[in-house]
Curated annotation (Swiss-Prot):
Role played: Catalyzes the initial step of the lipid cycle reactions in the biosynthesis of the cell wall peptidoglycan: transfers peptidoglycan precursor phospho-MurNAc-pentapeptide from UDP-MurNAc-pentapeptide onto the lipid carrier undecaprenyl phosphate, yielding undecaprenyl-pyrophosphoryl-MurNAc-pentapeptide, known as lipid I.
Keyword field: Cell cycle, Cell division, Cell inner membrane, Cell membrane, Cell shape, Cell wall biogenesis/degradation, Magnesium, Membrane, Metal-binding, Peptidoglycan synthesis, Transferase, Transmembrane, Transmembrane helix
Protein's organism: Thermodesulfovibrio yellowstonii (strain ATCC 51303 / DSM 11347 / YP87)
Catalytic activity annotation: UDP-N-acetyl-alpha-D-muramoyl-L-alanyl-gamma-D-glutamyl-meso-2,6-diaminopimeloyl-D-alanyl-D-alanine + di-trans,octa-cis-undecaprenyl phosphate = di-trans,octa-cis-undecaprenyl diphospho-N-acetyl-alpha-D-muramoyl-L-alanyl-D-glutamyl-meso-2,6-diaminopimeloyl-D-alanyl-D-alanine + UMP
InterPro entries: Glycosyl_transferase_4, PNAcMuramoyl-5peptid_Trfase, PNAcMuramoyl-5peptid_Trfase_CS
Transmembrane segment boundaries: 28-48, 73-93, 98-118, 132-152, 168-188, 199-219, 235-255, 263-283, 288-308, 338-358
Gene Ontology cellular-component terms listed: plasma membrane
GN (gene name): mraY
NCBIfam families to which the protein is assigned, alphabetical: mraY
Localization per Swiss-Prot or TrEMBL: Cell inner membrane
UniProt similarity note: Belongs to the glycosyltransferase 4 family. MraY subfamily.
The name this protein goes by in its record: Phospho-N-acetylmuramoyl-pentapeptide-transferase
Required co-factors: Mg(2+)
Involved pathway(s): Cell wall biogenesis; peptidoglycan biosynthesis
Top-level taxon: Bacteria
Length: 361
C-alpha cells in the first residue's frame, strides 16, 4: 500500500528509489512489525485479561506449569495484526505469491482462533475436534497447493529440489499435490506442538524466518539463483518482505512471551506461523530445507507420533516421560529457561546448516 505510493513517486523524487529494493523493504517490514507488536501488545494483554481469555492448564502436564493458569492466551492475534500491517505497508500487493501467503496465514490463524476460543469457553484443552481441525487445514492447504499447481508462471510446479546437489530435481508429477499438502499441514501442526514453553515457538519461528528470507531473495533473483544453483522462480523474492514481517512480529512478541510469559500466542499464532513456513517452502521448492531449519519442529512432532503409537502398541508404555519432547526434559528436572535456550541454540545451528546447503552444491 505505502510501497505502491512511494514507488509511483520515485520517478519524480530520486531518493525514493530505495523503496524499489526488496532488501530495504524487508528491513522496514522487520522494524514495522516489531514496533507495532511492541506498542499494541500491552493494551491487547489487558484486553485479553478483561475478557477472561486466559490459558487453561492441563492437570496431567508438568506441575511447574500450574502457576501459568490464568495467563492471557490468543496473543497470536497480535502477531497476525503486526505481520499484516507490515506486509500491507511494504509488500508489493500486485505479486500473486504475496496474496497466497496472506490467505494461508490468515486461514490457519482463523482455524487456530476458533480452536482457542472453544478451549476457553469450554474451559478445557480440547477445543475444536481433531477431525474438524484437520479437515479445515487440509482444505486450506489443498487450496494453496492447487493454486500453485495451476500457476502457468511457475515452471517447477511439481518438482522436488534436493539440497547439497547441483539442481538435482525430482518431478513427482501429480503426487506432488499430496506431498505439498502434507508439508503445509505438517508444518502448521509441528509449530503448534512446539508452542508449549514460554517463547520457544516464537524464537524458533524467528530463526526460520531469517533463513527463509535469504532463500526467497535468492530464489527470486536470477543472477544469485544461477550462481548458487537454486531454482529461479520469478516473483518469490518479494516474499522476503513477508518473512521480515514474521521475524519482527516474533521478536516483538518475545518481549512479552519470554519466560515468565505475560501472554501466550495460542493456536491462532502457532498454526498461522507454522502454516506460513510450510507455504513458503512449497512455493520456493525448499521443502527439504524446511525440515532441516525446522528440525526442532520435526523432532517435536515425531516425539508425539512415536509416543502415541508406542503407547497403543504396548498397552500403556511410553518412550518419553511426556511428549512433546520439551516436556520430557522438563520432567527430567531441566529448568524451563534452559530447555528453551538450548532448543534455540540447536535451531540456530540448524539454520546455519541450512544456509550451508547453498554452497554445498
Amino acid at each position: 500500500m505505502l510501497y505502491e505510493i512511494l514507488y509511483s513517486l520515485s520517478d519524480y523524487i530520486s531518493g525514493l528509489n530505495v523503496f524499489k529494493y526488496i532488501t530495504f523493504r524487508t528491513m522496514l517490514a522487520i522494524l514495522t512489525s516489531f514496533f507495532f507488536t511492541f506498542i499494541i501488545a500491552p493494551p491487547c494483554i489487558r484486553w485479553l485479561k478483561k475478557l477472561s481469555l486466559t490459558q487453561h492448564i492441563r492437570d496431567d502436564g508438568p506441575k511447574t506449569h500450574l502457576k501459568k493458569e490464568g495467563t492471557p492466551t490468543m496473543g497470536g492475534i497480535i502477531i497476525t495484526a503486526s505481520v499484516l500491517v507490515a506486509v500491507l505497508m511494504w509488500g508489493n500487493l500486485k505479486n500473486h505469491y504475496m496474496w497466497i501467503m496472506i490467505i494461508s496465514f490468515l486461514g490457519f490463524g482463523l482455524i487456530g482462533f476458533i480452536d482457542d476460543y472453544l478451549k476457553i469457553t469450554r474451559k478445557n484443552y480440547k477445543g475444536l475436534p481433531g477431525r474438524y481441525k484437520l479437515f479445515a487445514q487440509l482444505l486450506l492447504a489443498s487450496s494453496v497447493t492447487l493454486f500453485l499447481y495451476f500457476n502457468p508462471k511457475d515452471p517447477y510446479t511439481t518438482v522436488l529440489s534436493i539440497p547439497f546437489f547441483k539442481q538435482w530435481l525430482i518431478d513427482l508429477g501429480i503426487f506432488y499435490l499430496p506431498f505439498a499438502i502434507f508439508v503445509i499441514v505438517g508444518s502448521s501442526n509441528a509449530v503448534n506442538l512446539t508452542d508449549g514453553m514460554d517463547g520457544l515457538a516464537a524464537g524458533l519461528v524467528g530463526i526460520a524466518s531469517i533463513v527463509n528470507a535469504v532463500l526467497l531473495y535468492i530464489s527470486g533473483h536470477a543472477v544469485f539463483a544461477k550462481y548458487l544453483y537454486v531454482l529461479y522462480i520469478p516473483g518469490t523474492g518479494e516474499l522476503a518482505v513477508f518473512c521480515g514481517a514474521m521475524l519482527g512480529a516474533c521478536l516483538g512478541f518475545l518481549w512479552y512471551n519470554s519466560y515468565p510469559a505475560e501472554v501466550f500466542m495460542g493456536d491462532v499464532g502457532s498454526l498461522s506461523l507454522g502454516g506460513a513456513l510450510g507455504s513458503l517452502a512449497v512455493i520456493t521448492k525448499h521443502e527439504i530445507v524446511l525440515a532441516l531449519v525446522g528440525g526442532i519442529f520435526v523432532v517435536e512432532a515425531l516425539s508425539v507420533i512415536l509416543q502415541v503409537g508406542y503407547f497403543k502398541l504396548t498397552n500403556g508404555k511410553r518412550i518419553f516421560r511426556m511428549a512433546p519432547l520439551h516436556h520430557h526434559f522438563e520432567l527430567k528436572k531441566w529448568p524451563e529457561p534452559k530447555v528453551i535456550v538450548r532448543f534455540w541454540i540447536i535451531g540456530i545451528i540448524l539454520a546455519l546448516l541450512s544456509l550451508l546447503t547453498l554452497k554445498l552444491r
